[in-house]
């Protein structure tokens, strides 16, 4: 039988992996080394050469998209339908298993999957029913606790509290939650895996059936597996199943959600005699980019070891740009993308990667100013994020009590005991009397028409809004915003949300404070109060909408979201200590190596051109900070990196200019370094200029007001 079509398009190491004998196998697949192709061709090899039935093959991926692509490529390669093969995610395959054996798993036939939002709502009700203070026992923290225990394979009765009252309370919440789910026939995502694992443990005949069936098991992205997923595969394989895992210890970046890079080493220990094949030839990046990636990751300890290489060109050196602040950084990136576009490149070929979602705001504004369409990959635009919309709704209600949409969003956020029944009365009164919701509340309270506890909670909420409006009216906008975020309870609510997600929400709220501080009026906003002008600005930015899916657009995403993707031109911004690596990774032991792996992932996304940027000073989370350049920059080979020098037309703050540097002047009549006075913002120094004539724009560093961009024709600046 001619099987050359399975091997001809592969390199030597890929062929070795595809045609390996049926035994346990680790394929250590470097970034861009063609691992999906190897998996697909291996499955085809098993069927065509080893005469394995599709019925005997299970292939596990981490996303539904990857599973669909694998099925499609197998079908294309084999030319026939592969019925009987199981290809899917861990959760998808566990769900399929539980549907087939629902009675043995003690589930009703029509059991339903509980998504994360439904899970959170159920926990809120249970915590309230248990008479627990939601502030002390946040539902989000309960959800994190329960999911973490399930990922470790633990039921409430397995957990050792050692007399710790906090642990005992969470244990009771977990128990009550599980009982509620069982009564209602509900299964959350973590439960799918745990219940399927328990099914096999408790019903040996079912386990034996699947062991005899699935004698060929293939698992992708093995470095991202958690404890229960590893146990699942280990149990299914038994002593006779043949397992091929594909992974890269250098790309393990999900430790914060339970992934265990150690599972690759566990596999080698638990499956004695397993062979290891390294895929090191890269088909994505230039030699310079790969040299940088190799040098970077070599600083990690305990690696299984591999070195990426390519037979392609050296390519351009990596560009390194030192910006004087985050605004300069954003403009530099946008200008580079514009040059790429002018030279015939597509916007969609450019990706901007950042460590924290909060960094996207300044980049989004720079792209909007340049009329450059963009898309946030795997996330929402800054002003569309939940925590930002919450904060803006408070500000909107302070500015206008009759804003019904804002009222609806925040009246019970954070939870303050105003239930749906009370709000239904308010809504009905609003409709019947043709009042706004705020007015309806006022009348119902005056008439004493609401129940005692609900009336008290509603009264306190209205007093809070009135007090914030009165007490913050004369504050600078950024101080007012910060005060509202704190006094509303939003900051406390999100501080109680465990893990990186909660930290990200806090960072975004602090970045909103920065946005209000940097906000400057447009000409059409001159007659508005600062808060009203900013709310208009925020609404317009949110209303811009993301680029249509068919539209050529710059791609913005976190480094985590970038995994598995590739782009001809990549920018990694915010390469500073405390930004990347993150402050959390510096504060917590054992996190730095995962940050370096994340940097490695970012670098290896670039195909042709990689640019790294850092800022000397950055207004971050409401305050000015000075960070050292990231240690990751210093770990790159000097011969691979080229520092971008500032042109004469790009200015740095006066404090950073060398003595004797001539001032730059444009036809607006203003000069760099010139001291000026603005009627609203006070005195400041011109630190940058762009455009000419009536379109000239000035960047002015104002004392106590921060750095602002102004249109020269409308700014009415006086020379000091």
UniProtKB/Swiss-Prot annotation:
Q: Which domain of life is it from?
A: Bacteria
- CDD domains, per this entry? DEXQc_UvrD, SF1_C_UvrD
Query: What are the binding positions for ATP in this chain?
Result: 32-37, 284
A single GO molecular function, which one?
DNA translocase activity
Q: Which residues form the UvrD-like helicase C-terminal domain?
A: 287-564
What cellular component terms from Gene Ontology apply here? Answer: cytosol; DNA helicase complex; single-stranded DNA-dependent ATP-dependent DNA helicase complex
Under which EC number(s) is this enzyme classified? 5.6.2.4
Q: Which GO biological process entries does UniProt record here?
A: mismatch repair; mismatch repair involved in maintenance of fidelity involved in DNA-dependent DNA replication; nucleotide-excision repair; recombinational repair; replication fork processing; response to radiation; rolling circle DNA replication; SOS response
Q: What does this protein do?
A: A helicase with DNA-dependent ATPase activity. Unwinds DNA duplexes with 3'-5' polarity. Translocates on single-stranded DNA with 3'-5' polarity. Initiates unwinding more efficiently from a nicked substrate than double-stranded DNA. Involved in the post-incision events of nucleotide excision repair and methyl-directed mismatch repair, and probably also in repair of alkylated DNA.
Protein name, entry field: DNA helicase II
| Organism encoding this protein | Escherichia coli (strain K12)
């Amino acid at each position: 039988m001619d099987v050359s079509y399975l091997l001809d398009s592969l390199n030597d190491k890929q062929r070795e992996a595809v045609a390996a004998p049926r035994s346990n196998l680790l394929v250590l697949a470097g970034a861009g080394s063609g691992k999906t192709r190897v998996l697909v061709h291996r499955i085809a090899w098993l069927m065509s050469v080893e005469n394995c039935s599709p019925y005997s093959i299970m292939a596990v991926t981490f996303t539904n998209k990857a599973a669909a692509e694998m099925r499609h490529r197998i079908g294309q390669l084999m030319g026939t339908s592969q019925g009987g093969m199981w290809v899917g995610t861990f959760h998808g395959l566990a769900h399929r298993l539980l549907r087939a054996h629902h009675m043995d798993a003690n589930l009703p036939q029509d059991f339903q999957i509980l998504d994360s939002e439904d899970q959170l709502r159920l926990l809120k009700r249970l915590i309230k029913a248990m008479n627990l203070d939601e502030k002390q026992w946040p539902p989000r923290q309960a959800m994190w606790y329960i999911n973490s225990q399930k990922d470790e394979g633990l039921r409430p009765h397995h957990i050792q509290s050692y007399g710790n009252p906090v642990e005992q309370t969470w244990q009771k919440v977990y128990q009550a939650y599980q009982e509620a789910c069982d009564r209602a026939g509900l299964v959350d995502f973590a439960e799918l895996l745990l219940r399927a694992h328990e099914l096999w443990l408790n019903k040996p005949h079912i386990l034996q059936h699947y062991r005899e069936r699935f004698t060929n098991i293939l698992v992708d992205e093995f470095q991202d597996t958690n404890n229960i997923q590893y146990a699942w595969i280990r149990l299914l394989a038994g002593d006779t199943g043949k397992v091929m895992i594909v992974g890269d210890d250098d790309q393990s970046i999900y430790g914060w959600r339970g992934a265990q890079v150690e599972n690759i080493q566990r596999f080698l220990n638990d499956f004695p005699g397993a062979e290891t094949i390294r895929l090191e030839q890269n088909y994505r990046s230039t030699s310079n980019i790969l040299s940088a990636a190799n040098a970077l990751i070599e600083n990690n300890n305990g690696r299984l070891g591999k070195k990426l290489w390519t037979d392609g060109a050296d390519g351009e050196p990596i560009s390194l740009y030192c910006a004087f602040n985050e605004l300069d950084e954003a403009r530099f990136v946008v200008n580079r993308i514009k040059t790429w576009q002018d030279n015939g490149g597509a916007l969609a070929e450019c990706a901007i990667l950042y460590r924290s979602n909060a960094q996207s705001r300044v980049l989004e504004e720079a792209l909007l100013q340049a009329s450059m369409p963009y898309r946030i990959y795997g996330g929402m635009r800054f002003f569309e994020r939940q925590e930002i919309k919450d904060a803006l709704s408070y500000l909107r209600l302070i500015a206008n009590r009759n804003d019904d949409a804002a009222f609806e969003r925040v009246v019970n956020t954070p939870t303050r005991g105003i239930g749906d029944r009370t709000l239904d009365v308010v809504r009905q009164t609003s409709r019947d009397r043709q009042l706004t919701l705020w007015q309806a509340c006022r009348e119902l309270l005056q008439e004493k028409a609401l129940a005692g506890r609900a009336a008290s909670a509603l009264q306190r909420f209205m007093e809070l809004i009135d007090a914030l409006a009165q007490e913050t009216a004369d504050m600078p906008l950024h101080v007012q915003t910060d005060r509202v975020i704190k006094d509303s309870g939003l900051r406390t609510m999100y501080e109680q949300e465990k893990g990186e997600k909660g930290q990200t929400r806090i960072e975004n709220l602090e970045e909103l404070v920065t946005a209000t501080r940097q906000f400057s009026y447009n000409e059409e906003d001159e007659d508005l109060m600062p808060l009203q002008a900013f709310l208009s600005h925020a609404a317009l930015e949110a209303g811009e909408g993301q680029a249509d899916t068919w539209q050529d657009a710059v791609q913005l995403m976190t480094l985590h979201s970038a995994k598995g993707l590739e782009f001809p031109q990549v920018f990694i911004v915010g390469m500073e200590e405390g930004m990347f690596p993150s402050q959390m990774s510096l504060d917590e032991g054992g996190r730095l190596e995962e940050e370096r792996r994340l940097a490695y992932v970012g670098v290896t996304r670039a195909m042709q051109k990689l640019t790294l940027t850092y800022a000397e000073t950055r207004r971050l989370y409401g305050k000015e900070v000075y960070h050292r350049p990231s240690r990751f920059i210093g770990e790159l080979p000097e011969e691979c990196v080229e520092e971008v020098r500032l042109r004469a037309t790009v200015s740095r703050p006066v404090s950073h200019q060398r003595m004797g540097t001539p001032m730059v002047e444009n036809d607006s009549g203003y000069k760099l370094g010139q001291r000026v006075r603005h009627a609203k913002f006070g005195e400041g120094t011109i630190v940058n200029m762009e455009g000419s004539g009536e379109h000239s724009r000035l960047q002015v560093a104002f004392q106590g007001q921060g750095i602002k961009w102004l249109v020269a024709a409308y700014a009415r600046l006086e020379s000091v």
